[in-house]
A protein has these predicted regions:
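Redox- and metal-dependent alpha/beta enzyme cores, enriched for Fe-S-associated oxidoreductases
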Residues: 11-116
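Short, small-residue-biased leader/transition segments that mark boundaries at the very start
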Residues: 1-5
Length: 191
């Protein structure tokens, strides 16, 4: 879970997925398509609560339905599989996130970052690296700011927030990630 740029671009996150896999972890990267749903869904909230264009909300709702229809065959196949998890439903993600942060929180990754972390926790992925772009206050609020509440609601949550910026120490990032992985191993051996 993280800032979409830091999550999706290996050069922006010091090749985090490769690092996790080299350390023996299975990396689960939230779907980029879900970020598009988040952008569309925000328009629905704005029209209902902030007085923005109903036409924009209608187009966004149509966008959600079209993309859902296009990915429906894959979602159904994932649901039947033992090895894959079907894509999240944006309304469920929003409903889950709204228990912790307001859906009106739309700056940066907004409420969606919290929703993604909850989705990972609900799909038995308790070990989360929350990548943070340096100086992005909205991401720090909805990333680092909700970790305590997530741990309270999900004691199995093993979440580490990592700042990625040109001046950040790669060694510090690596040490914090390895500490999270060490905790994950200890928790796994308890099961």
């Amino acid at each position: 879970a993280s800032d979409v740029y830091k999550r999706q671009l290996p050069d922006a996150n010091n090749h985090l997925v490769e690092l996790l896999e080299r350390e023996g972890a299975e990396a689960v990267v939230p779907d980029l398509m879900d970020f598009m749903f988040y952008c569309f869904y925000n328009q629905l909230y704005k029209a209902d609560n902030l007085g923005t264009s109903k036409k924009s909300a209608k187009i966004s709702k149509m966008g959600i339905k079209i993309i859902e229809r296009l990915r429906k065959p894959a979602a159904e196949a994932f649901a039947k599989s033992k090895h894959f998890i079907p894509p999240a439903d944006i309304e469920e993600t929003a409903r889950n996130a709204s228990e912790i942060v307001s859906i009106g929180n739309q700056t940066g990754e907004g409420w969606f970052l919290t929703g993604e972390m909850l989705e990972l926790l609900h799909t038995d992925t308790p070990n989360i690296v929350c990548t943070q772009p340096f100086g992005c206050l909205p991401n720090h609020v909805v990333g680092k700011g909700v970790i305590k509440e997530l741990r309270k609601r999900h004691p199995e949550a093993n979440i580490v927030a990592i700042d990625y910026d040109p001046g950040a120490s790669e060694v510090n990032q690596l040490n914090r990630i390895k500490l999270m992985l060490s905790t994950a191993q200890k928790n796994l051996s308890k099961k």
